Design a protein with these regions (language model features):
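Non-heme di-metal
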Residues: 1-241
Length: 241
């Protein structure tokens, strides 16, 4: 049984197994698992992930705006507070922790603008989370992001450590490997209740999850394409000397 199959099973089939397997099969995640991802492509990931993740509170607020239940909004507000450094996972905003990590590695996001695939991922997540049907936003943000963060980040952390990035500077990843599963389970409870009331909406939920996971797959694929293009440009420049 593949890790993607195991994860999907733990979520009672809510997570699209085929989409997860395609995500795991990307060259980037494969290299991370094998411990052979280059430092260059990992640095590219860290910067592009910043361009995506800095909008996380916008994604969450968009979803919150479409939840009719006050209890549901209250439950997810805890996630928002933690992102802002006001919850139980620490007193520093997560965006600041990420920036500190980039600074430790000498990476400046403004020097590497978002790739087209990164911009597409951001726009798709915002669009789906803003949908008037909360199951669309839950499919994207829960099933397409929070629920798979521990699974994906563990692979990336393996790649970062194998490439020699100091563990002391990588606290952002263990924090989310340990913490995001709880956030996802909070959303899962909302999803299960919504599906009990509206069982015909299961395909809507799954479609949103598949769409955002595919956008994430394209995001990962672009990292190694960019690496190959950079290597090709370097060879051409060397040949011209």
């Amino acid at each position: 049984m593949t890790p993607a199959t195991q994860l999907s099973a733990r979520w009672n089939g809510l997570l699209p197994r085929e989409s997860l397997e395609r995500l795991d099969a990307t060259e980037f995640l494969t290299r991370c698992r094998q411990g052979i991802a280059s430092r260059g492509v990992l640095e590219r990931f860290l910067v592009q992930q910043y361009h995506y993740s800095r909008h996380f509170t916008r994604y969450l607020c968009a979803l919150l705006a479409n939840l009719a239940s006050e209890a549901d909004r209250f439950a997810l507000t805890e996630n928002l507070f933690e992102e802002m450094g006001l919850g139980g996972m620490g007193e520093v905003p997560h965006s600041q922790i990420y920036r500190q990590m980039l600074e430790a590695f000498g990476l400046e996001p403004s020097a590497q603008p978002p790739l087209a695939e990164t911009t597409s991922l951001v726009r798709n997540m915002l669009r789906l989370c803003s949908d008037s049907d909360p199951l669309v936003g839950l499919g994207a943000l829960c099933l397409g992001a929070e629920a798979i963060v521990p699974h994906v980040y563990q692979q990336i952390l393996t790649g970062l450590l194998s490439a020699g990035f100091p563990e002391k500077d990588l606290i952002f990843f263990p924090m989310h490997i340990d913490g995001d599963d709880e956030h996802a389970l909070t959303m899962k409870q909302i999803i299960e209740r919504e599906l009990t009331e509206r069982p015909g909406k299961r395909d809507v939920l799954r479609g949103a999850a598949e769409e955002i996971i595919e956008a994430r797959r394209a995001f990962f694929a672009a990292l190694t394409v960019s690496e190959a293009q950079a290597a090709s440009a370097s060879r051409r420049a060397s040949g011209a000397l």
